[in-house]
Amino acid sequence: MLVFARDPQTAGILGNALMVGDVSKTYLAVVRGWIPEQGSIDHPLRDEPEDRRRKSDPQPLREARTCYQRVAITEIPVAIEGHSTSRYSLVRLHPETGRKHQLRRHMKHIGHPIIGDANHGRGRHNRYFAERFGQGRLMLAAIEITFPHPVGGEMLVLKADPERSFNDVLTIFSEPLEELIS
């Protein structure tokens, strides 16, 4: 989901709304393991340098918070990491701050990496999903953004269904698709 401004002044207003926390975002993600029903992750993160060669330059820790709610869980009869079955959760994620790769890094931090995350996830699980569903995408989808209209100030709520490749993976959960993504 992308939001565009038609002129620099409006872009500045939208950018300011992001900076002061007036923008709310909601994502869906498929993660490894059975995550608790709900929770919050308050784990500071360092900015990741664009140039990986500069990784040795220490960056300051910045506050980072994410809230989550479990939508569904599943256990499939596929042995991936020494267990006879594999467990996954569908979660709704609400970042309260906006750090680079915050959701990916926070989910890894609590031991439930997002499926398809090559940098922060688990290769065996990612390969299984890529082989089973014919694509190796990151299983993270923006589904809602709420922000004040840059001119009138009324709250705008924009919603989007996940793309088809994301929905295809949701067939591992027993709940109907409409219940999972609403």
Which residue stretches match the model-derived regions?
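RNA pseudouridine synthases
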Residues: M1-S182
